[in-house]
């Protein structure tokens, strides 16, 4: 993948393999990997789930898939084209899109910037849609700058993060 417009950073296969068990998948779950890249998360998914994928650099845009999925598991690029065609932060775009389509959960790899992306108004949207951050797994990836986290959001279970809706 020579084009790095979207700030593509390949997920180490071992990391994907070690993170998948944190996701409470059950037999028959429909799972999409919307930013497949070279397939680290997709290939690490257990055989008992139904898998689908998208990859913008292979002309299979995640927004062109219309099915609903139980789980979304991915390492999104740092930026994607927004509705105006300008490159923008992809983490909120991922959550905004899939919190209306995923039935059980969303798990994604992101850096510390993802916390800044969760503004009070965006946290309110997640709460209105019934989503909670249920787990954050800290990851050390030496070849990447900064600290990385595997965020797991679910409709079921209890969240560990809350917000103050007022800006001070």
Spans of features found by a protein language model:
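Class I S-adenosyl-L-methionine-dependent methyltransferase catalytic core
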Residues: 1-168
């Amino acid at each position: 993948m020579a084009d790095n417009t979207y700030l593509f950073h390949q997920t180490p296969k071992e990391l994907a393999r070690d993170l998948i068990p944190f996701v409470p998948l059950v037999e028959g779950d429909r799972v999409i990997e919307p930013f497949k890249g070279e397939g680290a998360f997709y290939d690490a998914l257990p055989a008992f789930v139904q898998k689908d994928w998208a990859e913008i650099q292979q002309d299979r845009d995640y927004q062109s898939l219309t099915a609903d999925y139980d789980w979304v598991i991915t390492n999104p690029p740092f930026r994607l084209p927004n509705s105006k065609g300008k490159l923008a932060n992809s983490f909120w775009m991922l959550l905004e899109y899939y919190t209306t389509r995923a039935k059980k959960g969303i798990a994604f790899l992101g850096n510390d910037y993802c916390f800044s992306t969760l503004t009070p108004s965006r946290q309110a949207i997640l709460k209105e849609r019934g989503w909670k951050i249920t787990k954050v797994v800290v990851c050390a990836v030496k070849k990447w700058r900064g600290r990385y986290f595997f965020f797991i959001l679910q409709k079921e279970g209890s969240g560990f993060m809350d917000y103050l809706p007022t800006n001070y």
